[in-house]
Curated annotation (Swiss-Prot):
InterPro entries: HisE, PRib-ATP_PPHydrolase-like. It comes from Thiobacillus denitrificans (strain ATCC 25259 / T1). It comes from the Bacteria. Pfam families: PRA-PH. Pathway: Amino-acid biosynthesis; L-histidine biosynthesis; L-histidine from 5-phospho-alpha-D-ribose 1-diphosphate: step 2/9. Belongs to the PRA-PH family. NCBIfam families: histidine_hisI (TIGR03188), PRK00400.1-3 (NF001611). It is found in: Cytoplasm. The keyword Calcium does not apply. One of its GO terms (biological process) is L-histidine biosynthetic process. This is Phosphoribosyl-ATP pyrophosphatase. SUPFAM superfamilies: all-alpha NTP pyrophosphatases. Its EC number is 3.6.1.31.
Length: 108
């Protein structure tokens, strides 16, 4: 799984040098964080709607869009999928309640 995430991360990094006229991702980068966050919000909503429709194919399609735009955000902020995978590995074996209690400030 991390192979495709790594390849996407490389492509997304390269798109930082692309023209916004030639690349959808470069256009998102040029518009800035708020535009990327708006797109993530749209994709999250579409994911929820697909889940409510209870159609596996639509759920997979929308989650792929959501993951992709989340990867765009990570790249925009200078982060990599490996950073998230490391955090997930750190949490592995912790109960959700324990993990939440361990967070600074105890917020979501």
């Amino acid at each position: 799984m991390s192979d495709i995430l790594d390849r996407l991360a490389e492509i997304l990094e390269a798109r930082k040098q692309a023209s916004p006229d030639a690349s959808y991702v470069a256009r998102l980068y040029a518009k800035g964080t708020d535009a990327i966050l708006k797109k993530i919000g749209e994709e999250a909503t579409e994911t929820v709607m697909a889940a409510k429709d209870d159609q596996a194919e639509k759920i997979i399609y929308e989650v792929a869009d959501l993951w992709f735009h989340t990867l765009v955000l990570l790249a925009h902020k200078g982060l990599k999928p490996a950073d998230v995978l490391e955090e997930l590995a750190r949490r592995e074996g912790l109960s959700g309640l324990t993990e939440k209690a361990n967070r600074q400030g105890g917020s979501t």
